[in-house]
Amino acid sequence: MSKYEKAYLYFDTNFLECRHSGKSLYLSQFTVNPSYYEIEDMIFNMGLTDKVELCIPDVVWLELQEHLIKHFKSEKSSMESKINAFRKSFGNLAEIYCEFKDCVDDSDYKNYVSEIAQDFLDNPRVNSKIIPCPKDENSMKMIIDQAIHSIRPFRVAKAGSKEYSDAGFKDALIFHTILTHTNEQLGILISNDNDFSELFNGEYASNLKMCNNVKDVRNILSQEFNITIADMVETLLHTDDYLIQRILSECEFDKNTHMDSLSIKSCKSNEDNAEVSFKALINGIQYSFDIEYNLNAKELLNASCEIIDETEAD
């Protein structure tokens, strides 16, 4: 039995942001890393929706929006410069212009970002909550003390000949948000930022963990809540219609075939793979199925079936 009643998953900016062409953000919609949705699905498949909460610290939430606004300004300026250069090059040979439909100036885009950010939160597919940063006097004093003494996540940064001990203020706000909101439950930060490493994974508090990918999140939750890969695949068989159709297709059933009365016979796991035997009714006939499924790759590796002899059926 887990020593925690709840787990809180916190997303850092560098994990949530989704970029294309190397470094460009999607400016017309609030797009997040596809791994975010993988984590949502994983929590459902693990049967942990009542125990795990997805959280976005408000500092991260504001930073995601600010990055969009800054990128819009930069890209708009860059495009205008290129258009002017093209006009000079082509002269009367071409008519070159660009028209913005909804966002004529920067203030329009700032309002637009607020709208698409809220649309993201309102999407039924998204189950994250925005977690406010603690603003009480004790928290502020602790953050200031950490900044003065360059205690992680603060660090000394150089600019010219000067040294600054308050680099990492944003990270400090995120950390104290996590610390306050998690309390004595399990807190997991999903981030690619190494500056957090000294504060997580037991070095600061035993209930705070850090990782940077979906598989590690799954491993932490599996260990803390005693969930096996076999358990997860069993849940998938009862909830994932696409997986059932893949199994039926591999076993050469017709496309519109339906499976009823599915019952697990045995289930064992080996690393990321699960081997499952189950029985089910197909058109009133009882079959025995054997499958191998890779949970990390979400891939059906093997599937076979045979009719169960009625004289041997349970």
Q: What residues fall within each predicted segment?
A:
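Active-site-proximal, substrate-binding regions of enzyme catalytic domains
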Residues: S2-Q185, D195-E312
